[in-house]
Design a protein with these regions (language model features):
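Active-site-adjacent pocket-lining segments in enzyme domains
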Residues: 4-8, 13-16, 27-36, 55, ...
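N-terminal beta-loop-helix "entrance" segment that forms/cooperates
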Residues: 35-54
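Histidine-anchored nucleotide/phosphate-binding helix
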Residues: 22
């Protein structure tokens, strides 16, 4: 059975943190719905890139039809998502049903607002740790996986964030195969 992912975005979201994980999830043949949190047909990213969505938030009748809920960071996109009561409720519902919840960069503030990070290790873009309720903040790891919660630091690790989502959902060699196909190991010697 194909795993389904709800990928929410709002105006001012970081485009790289949206597109890189989306690309990797679709390479892994996950069914990903790109959904506007503001109920528009498109959003404008933090760097003025227009992103056409698959669905609007009001189209979602039951968030539990998804296996994961994911959001990119960026500002003011993360703040808009945090201030969206429906997004907060979706995150609470998914987390309480032990489904995957994932956020990158500034977006872990949404998980914190939903009460998800209290007992979880987490990371975020530097400086946002002060807004998180995580009892175990990790500033050294690019991506943190703690049970059904994945957090990541920012744009440079968006690809790794996508791999971890795929790895969590599929629990097979798919993520590693995609890493090889995308030449990620080449970076090891070049950064």
């Amino acid at each position: 059975m194909t795993k389904k992912v709800a990928l929410f975005v709002d105006n001012g979201g970081e485009e790289l943190e949206l597109i890189a994980p989306l690309d990797i999830m679709r390479r892994a043949n996950l069914e990903v719905d790109l959904i506007s949190a503001n109920n528009a047909e498109y959003v404008i990213g933090a760097h003025n890139i227009k992103i056409i969505v698959d669905k609007k938030i009001n189209d979602i009748e039951d968030i539990l039809e998804y296996d994961a809920i994911v959001i990119p960071g960026g500002m003011p996109g993360s703040t808009l998502l945090r201030n969206n009561n429906k997004i907060i409720e979706f995150f609470k519902t998914m987390y309480n049903e032990d489904k995957l919840v994932a956020a990158i960069c500034a977006a872990p503030i949404v998980l914190s607002a939903a009460g998800i990070l209290k007992d979880r290790e987490a990371t975020s873009y530097p400086g946002f740790d002060k807004e998180l309720e995580s009892q175990s903040y990790n500033s050294k790891k690019a991506v943190v996986v703690d049970k059904n919660v994945i957090t990541a630091q920012g744009p440079a690790v968006a690809i790794l964030f996508g791999y971890e989502i795929v790895n969590y959902l599929l629990k097979d060699e798919t993520a590693n195969n995609i890493k090889e196909q995308m030449l990620l190991p080449v970076l090891k010697d070049n950064i």
